[in-house]
Swiss-Prot record:
The protein, known as: Protein phosphatase inhibitor 2
Biased composition (Acidic residues): 121-130, 167-179
Keyword Lyase found: no
A Pfam family per the record: IPP-2
GO MF annotations in UniProt: molecular function inhibitor activity; protein phosphatase inhibitor activity; protein serine/threonine phosphatase inhibitor activity
The protein's role, per its UniProt record: Inhibitor of protein-phosphatase 1.
Domain of life: Eukaryota
InterPro entries per record: PPI-2
Species of origin: Homo sapiens (Human)
Sites bearing Phosphothreonine, chain numbering: T73, T89, T92
Record PTM N-acetylalanine, positions in chain: A2
């Protein structure tokens, strides 16, 4: 009989039957409205944003960033604040040669603005440095000028290469002329007497 009762019972699954869900819906409809609000408030979450900010983003956290103390690279602005500076529209238009000549003559004695600004800023920066730091900064700026003066280095290299090539050409010409003279003296020596050969040797030396 135990076998027959087991076969009559339905196998229960993990999922709820439709009959159980409909009965729960009827029961929930009978509940007052206040209980539904309590259930919704239990399901929703409230975030304490200030606590999250204080925990994960504290004010003293540096995020792995560090301050690098190195001399600033000079920036030279090409556009000036005065009216003489060319704007984009002026640059595209053709300028009359006489106007250009007058502007060049007027600007001939003036120093570029970026150099004036550089001198002013360097004076302000050097005032708060110790003598050792000033010397270190001066050496750094000198090395930077030497390093970034590549155009001069290329010109010097070209001059050295051309000088070496010119010297090599002269050496080759001298060897060729010396070989030619020795061949000429040998040919003349073959057709002359021993006394003539001695005279030729005395003349050449």
């Amino acid at each position: 009989m135990a076998a027959s009762t087991a076969s009559h019972r339905p196998i229960k699954g993990i999922l709820k039957n439709k009959t159980s869900t409909t009965s729960s819906m009827v029961a929930s409809a009978e509940q007052p409205r206040g209980n539904v609000d309590e259930e919704l408030s239990k399901k929703s979450q409230k975030w304490d944003e200030m606590n999250i900010l204080a925990t994960y983003h504290p004010a003293d956290k540096d995020y792995g960033l560090m301050k690098i103390d190195e001399p600033s690279t000079p920036y030279h602005s090409m556009m000036g604040d005065d009216e003489d500076a060319c704007s984009d529209t002026e640059a595209t238009e053709a300028m009359a040669p006489d106007i250009l000549a007058r502007k060049l003559a007027a600007a001939e004695g003036l120093e570029p603005k970026y150099r004036i600004q550089e001198q002013e800023s360097s004076g302000e920066e050097d005032s708060d440095l110790s003598p050792e730091e000033r010397e270190k900064k001066r050496q750094f700026e000198m090395k930077r000028k030497l390093h970034y003066n590549e155009g001069l280095n290329i010109k010097l290299a070209r001059q050295l290469i051309s000088k070496d090539l010119h010297d090599d050409d002269e050496d080759e010409e001298m060897l060729e002329t010396a070989d030619g003279e020795s061949m000429n003296t040998e040919e003349s020596n073959q057709g002359s007497t021993p006394s003539d050969q001695q005279q030729n040797k005395l003349r050449s030396s």
